[in-house]
Each structure stands twice: as C-alpha cells, then as structure tokens.
C-alpha cells in the first residue's frame, strides 16, 4: 500500500512540476510580448531622435523631426500594441484568414478572393505619389522593427501556435480595403434584394418598401421627399404557407441589428463661447477588444519648417490620424451610404464562357487563387473577371452577375487624408476630401476662424444610364461609369444660415447633390432629426453641450409607439382579457421614454415594435427566401427604412396586409404584446425586466470564444449599457460609438475624447482597460494626452 502511495505522490509531484514549468514558460512568453514603454531603442530609418511619450492611459504622444520619422514611430507603437489586430485587418480583405485559423475561415476566404484585393493593393502601391510611398515605407519600417523588438510574439500567436508575418506596404492598403468591406456592400446585397423585390412583388410594392422620404428626414439643406402610398393588392405572399415556420424571438432578433455608421455635428464660431467652431463625432462600429482606433498625438515640423501638432484617433495598420484636430481645423466622419457600386446582369453565351459587351462577346478573364490553410493542404480556386469587375455569383434567377465597385479602382485608396494634419481652414479640408481615397464618408469640418462645412470625402463615380438601385445589364453601353467626379464638382455646404451642421448616415442633401451621391441604403433619419432638434434648442454652445447631445438617449423615435400602445392596444377590452397588462399600462403611463439601464418601459415599447414588424413582414420575407432558393437575400438589408411602411400599415390597417395567423389588426397587436411580455417574464417579474438587462456589453477579444477561460482576462466587463440605435446615444451589446470626440480647434485643452476598451491589446499592460469606464458612463475625459508616465526614445542607427 505504501508503495502505491509513493508512486501516486511521485506522479503528483511530476505533474505539478510539469504544470509549474509550463505555466512559468507560458507566463514568461506572454509577459515578454508586452510593449516597450521606457528606455531607448535603436531604429533604422530615422532622420533624428524620435520620442514616444505615454500617459497613464497609454495615450501616445510622438515627437519627431519630420513626418516620416513620426510615421516610423507610429508604426512601431501600432505593432507593439496592436499587431494581431492589424494582421486580422489585412488578412480579412486579402482572403488569408485560413492560414491563421484553419478551415473555419475557408468559406470567407474563398468568397472574398473574388475581389483579388491583394493584387489590387499591389497595383495601388505602384501608383502612389513618391511622397506618400515614402511615408508608407517609413510606417512599414516602424511596424516591422516594433514587431522584432518585442521579446516574444504577441500572445495571440502563441495561442494559435503561429508565427507573425512581417508587414508590407500593400498591407496598409488591405487594411483600408477591410474598412470598405465594413462600410459598404461587398457583394451588392442591397441591389440584389431590391431587384428581387421589384421583379417579384411589382413596382408599387418596390416603391412602398423602398421609400424616398419620410417624416424622419433631416437633411441639412431642408430637402424633402414623399413616402410611397400603400399598394392596394397587399402581400402576394400573404398565405398561411408563407407565414409558416418559427417566428424569430431570440436575443439576436431583439437586437434589431444596427448598421455601421456614425454621428457628427458642428456649430459655427457665431454660436460658441470662444469664436472657434466646435465639432462632435462618434463613429459607430462593431465593438471588440482591442478597439478599432488607437489614440495618438503627433508632433513634427513640415516642409516649411512649421510646427505641426495633430491629435485624434489612428487606425492600426495605417500611418494617418483618421479623425481629430490640428489646432486650425477639426474633422470627423460618418458613413455616407451613397451609391458606390452597381450589380451588373451579364448576358452570357450558351456555355457561359463569354459575356456580351458593347464590343460584342468577350471571354471571361480567369485568375487562379491559392489559399493557404493551417495544418492542411492549400486550396486552389479560380475567379473570373469582366471588363467591369469581378463575377460575384448569380442572382435569384440564376443569371450571372458582375460587380462594379469603387473599391476595385486605383483611386480607391491613397494617403491624401494625411494632408488634413496640416490643413489651415475649411476650404483646404474640402480640397483634400475631394481627392482622398477612402470609403466615401460624410466629412464635417470645423475651423478656428469659426467656419463649418460638410462634404463627401472619397471617390464619387460618375454614372451614365439607368443604373442605381437595382441590377441592370451593361451590354449595350447605355449603362456605364464615366470616370470619377472632378474635385470642383463635389457636393459641399459651408456656413449654412443656421450655423449648424449634422449628419447621421441618413440622407444629407437633396436635388443635384443627391444625384451625384446616390442612395446606397440610407439610415432612417431618426438620429439625425434628434440631433438637429437638440442643436436648434440652444443658441450658445460649449463642449459639454455637444457631449450632452452625444449622450442623449431619449426615445423620441419610439414615443409614437408608446402612445400607440397606450391608446390603440391597451384598450379596456384588452385589459379585461389580460390580467398582467394593467401593469404594462402603469409602466408606460405618463413617462418620458428613455433608454436607461433601469427602464422597463423602454424595453416593452422597443420589443413590441420589433414583434409587430417581424409578424407583419414575415410573409414577404418568406416569399423572397423561397424565390431566392434559400439564399440570404431578404428585407434585412433595407430594414432601416421599413419603419416607414410599417407605420403606414399599422395606422391605416388595410385588410390585404393582415397576416393569416391573426383575425384582426387588434389581434395582431395583442399577439405582439403578449409575446413581448412573455419573453420579458420568462424567468423573472416584469418590473425586473429592465433595458440594461437586455442591453449588456459583450465586448470581446476575437479569441475569447475559441480559447476556454481566456475571456476572463481579455474581455471587457459585462456592463449594462444605456442608449440604443434610433437615438444619438448609440450603444448596444456589441455595437456602438467606437469613440466620442468633441473639440474646438485651437482649444484642444477643453476638448473631450473617450473610447471603449483601451489603448492596449495586451491584458497585462498597466493601462489595459483604462478609459473604458469613461466611455460606458459618458464621463468627460480629456482630448489631449495627460501627464507623461512613460518615455521611449528611438534613435537612428
């Protein structure tokens, strides 16, 4: 017996030793991947000493002799803090995730390879102006030396059992291509869906589901467009069969998924306390660890030997300050949702080897693509191109389609945005915007002299023929793109009479300017109208006033739904049938609806609306899914304009649209409310079913789902969040303001800037997670970096 005890003890000691050794090695490796914060480092490619200072939150101030030196240092800190994030961005657009993650990413890689983004990135690099190429080379040198000077590879590679691959100049272009993928439709989903709606349901229904305007419109030029009338015939799909199947009521359904967007607004110097214009900007993106942006302040001397200081947010993978202030101007962006692409119906010969063009039938150009797959053999695929763009598949009728997209052209990407760092006024910013290569954005700019302006930053195609919302053939030559809009013709507005500007992903202008921009799927104007109304309520502003607008979570959009519930649904008859509904009425009565974490009323109204929408549009969604033979095209891609026909239907209540599972419109509303209450009270009392309980942060690292227990170290706290989608304070579980910035150029010391997660991508960093709570609570946190706590000096060798 004693012998077995000794063996057991020996085995235990061996196991403990192995565990301790493994843990010590693992700890050492992860600890070695921490960035250099203090001391000195010798770096190749600097013209002089460059200093990287960090404050207690890790916010970097980079001081160099010239812009290229600062680019080296910015690349250095990006690599040391965020290389894995940069790697994912380049691999995402290049279709190279499989080499990192294995077969799980192969479907994505095969699909995205149709765009051949790495080949396009290489071509763009060849055509960059010498000064921009030099800047990009400097940044790349910094990235690779920053990666090399880590004592161990970033911890993610240890977990994946991979080695990081050095950065190339083309990878910065791929990073920007990933932003194109995030901000625009890479497969023409919206046009394909609208084309299917028009062909399947008819033109009247197409106009009804895709209205040009509504009461929510808040264009800065006060332009208005009418909503479309309700077609008489009703849903063609309104049969019991089309409504069969499970009605969605999952948590994801109740998220009512948002679209990448943003808010920005500005007031001129005539309305500010110091004479400078003031800008506010919060860019809405999917939230993850680490955050999309990296905060930085860059100081250098330009070619005229003038001092430049620019502060804001940078994108790891690129050498520019994306949004910020330079003392003379401040600028920020919202996604424009203009029409930057077109789906082309190809007319092919019998064996699909050729397609018809204005010059007759031409053969497809075929490209071989080899996809490396972790721990497996490489996969080889072929992709086809046309004179207009890549073949991206077939439409619902089986017709081959190609895609014409700004992202495929040489002017899709350049580094002109970097010139904003030295712009002196709004007019100079306008000129830079009109030549910049980024996914087209609404740029709002404010300058120290008090001027404000709006324009589009990014390429604007000039379109000929009848193209736009739905797929069309280009075979005859009547439909085409004729280059890009010249800078002098760009839409812009400067110093409007109101001294106020605002954009929020909805339609910004009408008339000729709208004709140039087009409609690529505008958001409903609910956010924009609430921002506009807030701006109109005051005649004087400071930075706090603009932050208050960013944090406004009053549910103005849902007020009419609250009233509808109280007056049309919670009738005496309905209250008599449902005992619990008196409590619902009490919760809703005489309350200003706000998306606060403790609000039960907000959650009730919001989820009731979604259940009504889901039930009402279920038949047409199912019909489109059936016609499309199980593919993913449905009204999801036009969901943000569906509020307009939805409200028309519930107020007019035409019988032709009543779902067969309901006996009357009142029955539909009562079913929707019953489902709402049932879901909210599944495991708790109604009074405990708060909005914060549903809207709890799930801001995670990409690896936390795949590696057991690591989320405990990497993910942000599961905090209840105020705010929602159809209000300025956009904040959901995994989506929201990736930064909030308020700044008056020349008065940056009074500015405000905070963002989720933190500067660091390493969980053992001394500032990991610092600043996140400011973002959650909307605290005033300084725009400029704080006192220096860490200093790293880079010297040339």
Per-segment meaning from a language model:
Residues 298-320, 324-329, 333-478:
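Glycine- and hydrophobic-rich flexible loops that cap the catalytic core of alpha/beta enzyme folds
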Residues 516-517, 521-577, 665-797:
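Terminal end segments
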Residues 436-538, 604, 608-616, 625-626, ...:
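Hydrophobic alpha-helical segments
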Residues 70-73, 111, 120-133, 402-404, ...:
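Second-shell loop/turn segments in exported
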Residues 10, 22-278, 283, 289, ...:
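Substrate-recognition/specificity elements adjacent to catalytic centers across diverse enzyme folds
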Residues 64, 69-101, 332-380, 479-527, ...:
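Gly/Pro-rich active-site capping loops and adjacent beta-alpha segments
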Residues 605-690:
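Charged, long alpha-helical assembly modules
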Residues 1-17:
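N-terminal Sec-pathway targeting helices
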């Amino acid at each position: 017996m004693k012998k077995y005890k000794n063996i057991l003890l020996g085995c235990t000691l061996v196991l403990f030793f192995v565990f301790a050794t493994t843990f010590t090695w693992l700890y050492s490796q992860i600890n070695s991947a921490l960035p250099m914060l203090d001391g000195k480092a010798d770096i190749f490619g600097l013209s002089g000493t460059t200093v990287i200072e960090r404050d207690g939150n890790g916010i970097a101030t980079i001081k160099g002799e010239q812009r290229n030196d600062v680019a080296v240092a910015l690349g250095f800190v990006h690599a040391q803090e965020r290389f894995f994030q940069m790697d994912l961005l380049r691999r995402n657009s290049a279709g190279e995730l499989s080499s990192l993650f294995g077969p799980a990413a192969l479907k994505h890689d095969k699909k995205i390879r149709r765009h051949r983004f790495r080949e396009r990135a290489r071509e763009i690099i060849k055509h960059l102006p010498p000064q921009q190429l030099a800047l990009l080379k400097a940044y790349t040198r910094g990235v690779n030396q920053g990666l090399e000077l880590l004592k161990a590879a970033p911890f993610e590679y240890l977990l994946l059992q991979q080695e990081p691959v050095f950065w190339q100049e083309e990878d910065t272009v791929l990073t920007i291509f990933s932003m194109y993928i995030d901000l625009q439709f890479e497969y023409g989903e919206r046009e394909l869906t609208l084309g299917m709606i028009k062909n399947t349901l008819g033109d009247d229904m197409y106009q009804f589901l895709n209205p040009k305007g509504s009461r929510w419109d808040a264009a800065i030029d006060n332009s208005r467009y009418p909503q479309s009338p309700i077609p008489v015939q009703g849903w063609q799909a309104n049969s019991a069969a089309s409504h069969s199947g499970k009605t969605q009521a999952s948590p994801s359904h109740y998220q009512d998924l948002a679209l990448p967007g943003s808010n920005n607004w500005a007031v001129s110097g005539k309305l500010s306390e110091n004479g400078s214009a003031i800008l506010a900007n919060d860019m809405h993106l999917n939230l993850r660890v680490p955050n999309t942006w990296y905060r930085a302040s860059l100081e250098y001397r330009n070619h005229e030997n003038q001092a430049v200081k620019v502060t804001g947010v940078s994108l790891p993978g690129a050498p520019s300050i994306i949004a910020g202030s330079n003392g003379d101007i401040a600028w920020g962006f919202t996604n424009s949702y203009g029409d930057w692409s077109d789906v082309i119906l190809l007319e092919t010969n019998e064996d699909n080897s050729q397609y018809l063009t204005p010059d007759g039938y031409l053969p497809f150009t075929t490209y071989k693509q080899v996809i490396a797959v972790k721990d497996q053999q490489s996969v080889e695929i072929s992709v086809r191109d046309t004179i207009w763009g890549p073949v991206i598949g077939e439409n619902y009728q089986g017709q081959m389609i190609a895609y014409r997209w700004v992202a495929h052209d040489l002017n899709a990407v350049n580094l002109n945005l970097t010139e904003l760092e030295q712009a002196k006024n709004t007019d100079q910013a306008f000129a830079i915007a009109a030549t910049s290569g980024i996914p087209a954005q609404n740029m709002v700019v404010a300058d120290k002299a008090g001027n404000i302006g709006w324009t589009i930053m990014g390429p604007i195609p000039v379109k000929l023929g009848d193209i736009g919302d739905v797929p069309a053939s280009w075979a005859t030559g009547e439909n085409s793109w004729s280059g890009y809009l010249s800078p002098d013709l760009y839409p812009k507005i400067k110093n409007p009479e109101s001294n106020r500007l605002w954009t929020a992903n909805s339609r910004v202008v009408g008339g000729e300017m709208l004709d140039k921009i087009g409609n690529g799927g505008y958001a409903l104007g609910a956010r924009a109208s609430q921002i506009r109304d807030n701006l109109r309520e005051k005649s004087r502003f400071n930075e706090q006033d603009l932050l208050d607008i960013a944090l406004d979570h009053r549910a103005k959009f849902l007020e009419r739904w609250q009233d509808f519930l109280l007056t049309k649904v919670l009738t005496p008859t309905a209250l008599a049938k449902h005992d619990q509904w008196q409590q619902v009425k009490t919760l809703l009565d005489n309350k200003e609806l706000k998306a606060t974490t403790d609000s039960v009323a907000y959650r009730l109204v919001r989820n009731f609306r979604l259940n009504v929408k889901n039930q009402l549009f279920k038949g047409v969604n199912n019909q489109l899914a059936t016609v499309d033979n199980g593919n993913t095209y449905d009204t999801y891609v036009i969901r943000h304009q569906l509020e307009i026909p939805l409200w028309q239907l519930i107020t007019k209540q035409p019988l032709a649209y009543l779902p067969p599972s309901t006996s009357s419109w009142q029955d539909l509303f009562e079913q929707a409310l019953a489902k709402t209450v049932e879901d909210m009270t599944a495991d708790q009392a109604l009074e405990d079913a708060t909005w914060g309980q549903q809207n709890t942060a799930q801001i995670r690292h990409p690896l936390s789902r795949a590696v057991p227990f690591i989320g405990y170290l990497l993910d942000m706290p599961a905090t209840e969040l105020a705010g929602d989608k159809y209000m300025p304070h956009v904040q959901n579980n995994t989506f929201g303001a990736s930064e909030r910035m308020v700044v008056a150029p020349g008065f940056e010391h009074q500015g405000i800037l905070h963002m989720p997660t933190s500067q660091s991508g390493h969980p053992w960093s001394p500032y990991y997670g610092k600043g996140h709570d400011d973002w959650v609570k909307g605290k005033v946190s300084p725009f400029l970096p704080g006192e220096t706590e860490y200093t790293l000096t880079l010297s040339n060798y």
